[in-house]
């Protein structure tokens, strides 16, 4: 919500730390889809099953927008991704973001599962967050204009993305073709970020 003002503040390099706690949807207002909701996911506005016209819906039909990479293209003082599964990494990046915001715009994107909207037991929260990273569905990296982009946690032998997807009810309806699409996007996104890291080095 409110990307126009976020982009404007970043372009002006305002001395702001902007943190997004990303649960991949509008979870506090009824679990609606957002542009950061993953492809295939169930939400209250991307339902699963037959609709009134007899057409079968299988979740969100678009891929998620990669907001952190959009912020890198604003050439912010600092941009990073983090996960609630790796708190030391998150705290380290928060410290860096606070320092960077003293001289310009800093952006921190924290992936945080929502047990209700993602449909899994509360006691599995950390496990779901960890599997997102260990499958490369979520990548942990940081960027600044001087040092470029680099990974803070490399996953050299990732688990298949199915290990992440099957942990949540929001993906229960996926077809084999949809799962294949998601796995191919994970590989594609990883290659793209690696290319950016190489270019920025």
What is each model feature region?
Residues 35-100:
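Conserved thiamine diphosphate
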Residues 91-95, 101, 115-118, 133:
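Hydrophobic pocket-lining "lid/loop/helix" segments that shape and contact the acyl-thioester
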């Amino acid at each position: 919500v409110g990307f126009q003002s976020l982009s404007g503040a970043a372009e002006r390099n305002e001395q702001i730390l902007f943190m997004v706690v990303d649960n991949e949807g509008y979870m506090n207002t009824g679990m609606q889809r957002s542009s950061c909701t993953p492809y295939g996911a169930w939400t209250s506005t991307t339902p699963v099953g037959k609709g009134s016209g007899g057409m079968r819906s299988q979740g969100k039909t678009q891929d998620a927008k990669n907001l952190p990479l959009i912020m890198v293209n604003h050439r912010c003082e600092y941009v990073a991704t983090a996960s609630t599964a790796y708190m030391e990494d998150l705290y380290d990046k928060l410290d860096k973001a606070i320092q960077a915001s003293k001289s310009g715009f800093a952006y921190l994107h924290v992936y945080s599962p929502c047990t209700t909207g993602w449909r899994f037991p509360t006691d599995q929260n950390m496990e779901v967050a960890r599997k997102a990273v260990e499958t490369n569905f979520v990548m942990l990296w940081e960027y600044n204009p001087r040092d470029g982009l680099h990974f803070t946690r490399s996953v050299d032998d990732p688990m298949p993305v199915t290990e992440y997807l099957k942990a949540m009810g929001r993906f229960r309806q996926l077809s084999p073709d949809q799962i294949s699409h998601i796995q191919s996007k994970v590989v594609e996104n990883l290659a793209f970020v690696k290319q950016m890291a190489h270019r920025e080095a």
